[in-house]
C-alpha cells in the first residue's frame, strides 16, 4: 500500500514538472541554497536592523511615514547601492516630484536610472509589471502608493465617490506582481503616505492608503519618522530620523535604526558608523573626544564625522569591524542565474 502511494506521488510530481517546468515542486529539504541574496540599503544601521545585511531580493518592501520624513531618501539610497554593484534600477514617479539633482547627490546615476511618470495608477503598475517580468531590472521603486490614482477617478468629476477603487487596484496588481517579483529576484519598494481615520478614540488612528493588500504582500515594512532637528550653530542642517522595522519575514522585526538625514546630502554614513562603533567599543568616547586605536579623531561628534569623511580607509576598516561585531557580515549577492527560487511566505 505504501509503495502504491509512493508510486502515485512520483507520477504526480513528474506530471507537474512536465507541465510547469523543473523546480515547480520539490521537497523543502532538496533546496540547494537557502541563503537569501541581499543588496545593501545604503545605511549600515538599517542593514543591522533588517537582520540580514540589506534588502532581500525577490521581495516586496513598503516604506511609509509622514510627509518629509525621508521615505524617498531611503529608497534612493537603495537605488544608488544597486547601481554601484552594476545593477539596473527603475523609479515609477507617480507623485511627479523626483528631484534629479538630489538623487545625484545621494549617489544615483541619473543617466542610467529608468524613470516613468505615469498618468494613472493602472499605467504605473503595468509599467512596473513589465519591468519586473523582463528579469533585467534589479530594483523598482514606486513613489507613492497614495499617488496611484485609478483611471476611473482621473476621468471622473471632482467630488465623485470612488470607494475602494484604489484598494482593489492594489490588490489585483500585487496578486500579479508578487509571483514575477519572486521569480526574477527583483526588489520592489513601495513608498506610502499615512492618513488618519476619523473618529478613532483609542489606539493609533494612522493608516496607510491603498487597502490591506500591501501590508500582507510586503516581506518588510519600514516606518520612517523624524525624531529631532540637527543644528550647526543656529542653522538647521538635517534631521535625526528613526527607521522602525514594523514587519520582517526574514529576520526578527521591531528593530530601530537611527540615522542622520542631512539636507541635500541624504543619510550620513559617517554619523551612523560613529554611533555604532562607539556602542560596540570599537571607537572610544571619553568626554567630548572620540578616539580610534589610541589616536584622537575629533572633539565632538561633528568633528569626528568630518575626520572619518576625510579618511575613507579608516572608515572602511571601522565598517568591517562594526559589521563583524553586529554579526551581519557583508551583504550577500548571489548571481541571479545561480539562485534557487525562494518560496513566498504565506
Swiss-Prot record:
Transmembrane segments: none annotated. SMART domains: AAA. Keywords: ATP-binding, Cytoplasm, DNA damage, DNA recombination, DNA repair, DNA-binding, Nucleotide-binding, SOS response. ATP binds at residues 65-72. GO terms for molecular function: ATP binding; ATP hydrolysis activity; ATP-dependent DNA damage sensor activity; damaged DNA binding; single-stranded DNA binding. This is Protein RecA. The keyword DNA damage applies. Can catalyze the hydrolysis of ATP in the presence of single-stranded DNA, the ATP-dependent uptake of single-stranded DNA by duplex DNA, and the ATP-dependent hybridization of homologous single-stranded DNAs. It interacts with LexA causing its activation and leading to its autocatalytic cleavage. It is found in: Cytoplasm. GO terms for biological process: DNA recombination; DNA repair; SOS response. The gene is recA. It comes from Enterococcus mundtii. GO terms for cellular component: cytosol. HAMAP family: RecA. Belongs to the RecA family. Gene3D superfamilies: P-loop containing nucleotide triphosphate hydrolases. The keyword Glycoprotein does not apply. InterPro entries: AAA+_ATPase (IPR003593), DNA_recomb/repair_RecA (IPR013765), DNA_recomb/repair_RecA_CS (IPR020584), P-loop_NTPase (IPR027417), RecA-like_C (IPR049261), RecA-like_N (IPR049428), RecA_ATP-bd (IPR020588), RecA_C_sf (IPR023400).
Amino acid at each position: 500500500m505504501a509503495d502504491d502511494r509512493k508510486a502515485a506521488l512520483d507520477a504526480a510530481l513528474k506530471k507537474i514538472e512536465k507541465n510547469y517546468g523543473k523546480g515547480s515542486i520539490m521537497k523543502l529539504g532538496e533546496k540547494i541554497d537557502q541563503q537569501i541574496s541581499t543588496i545593501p540599503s545604503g545605511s549600515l544601521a538599517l542593514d543591522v536592523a533588517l537582520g540580514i545585511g540589506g534588502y532581500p531580493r525577490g521581495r516586496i518592501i513598503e516604506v511609509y511615514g509622514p510627509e518629509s520624513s525621508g521615505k524617498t531618501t531611503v529608497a534612493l539610497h537603495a537605488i544608488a547601492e544597486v547601481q554601484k554593484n552594476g545593477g539596473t534600477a527603475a523609479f515609477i514617479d507617480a507623485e511627479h516630484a523626483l528631484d534629479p539633482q538630489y538623487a545625484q547627490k545621494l549617489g544615483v546615476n541619473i543617466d542610467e536610472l529608468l524613470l516613468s511618470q505615469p498618468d494613472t495608477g493602472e499605467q504605473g503598475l503595468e509599467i512596473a509589471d513589465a519591468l519586473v517580468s523582463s528579469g533585467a531590472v534589479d530594483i523598482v521603486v514606486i513613489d507613492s502608493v497614495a499617488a496611484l490614482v485609478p483611471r476611473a477617478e482621473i476621468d471622473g468629476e471632482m467630488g465623485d465617490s470612488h470607494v475602494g477603487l484604489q484598494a482593489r487596484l492594489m490588490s489585483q496588481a500585487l496578486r500579479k506582481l508578487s509571483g514575477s517579483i519572486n521569480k526574477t529576484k527583483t526588489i520592489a519598494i513601495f513608498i506610502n503616505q499615512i492618513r488618519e481615520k476619523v473618529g478613532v478614540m483609542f489606539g493609533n488612528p494612522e493608516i496607510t492608503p491603498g487597502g490591506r493588500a500591501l501590508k500582507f504582500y510586503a516581506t518588510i515594512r519600514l516606518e520612517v519618522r523624524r525624531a529631532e532637528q540637527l543644528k550647526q550653530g543656529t542653522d538647521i542642517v538635517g534631521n535625526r530620523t528613526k527607521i522602525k522595522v514594523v514587519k520582517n519575514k526574514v529576520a526578527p522585526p521591531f528593530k530601530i535604526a537611527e540615522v542622520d538625514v542631512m539636507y541635500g546630502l541624504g543619510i550620513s554614513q559617517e554619523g551612523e558608523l560613529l554611533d555604532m562603533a562607539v556602542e560596540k567599543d570599537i571607537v572610544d568616547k571619553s568626554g567630548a573626544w572620540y578616539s580610534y586605536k589610541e589616536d584622537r579623531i575629533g572633539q565632538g561628534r561633528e568633528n569626528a564625522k568630518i575626520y572619518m569623511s576625510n579618511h575613507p580607509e579608516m572608515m572602511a576598516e571601522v565598517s568591517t569591524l562594526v559589521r563583524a561585531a553586529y554579526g551581519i557580515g557583508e551583504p550577500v549577492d548571489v548571481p541571479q542565474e545561480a539562485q534557487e527560487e525562494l518560496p513566498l511566505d504565506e
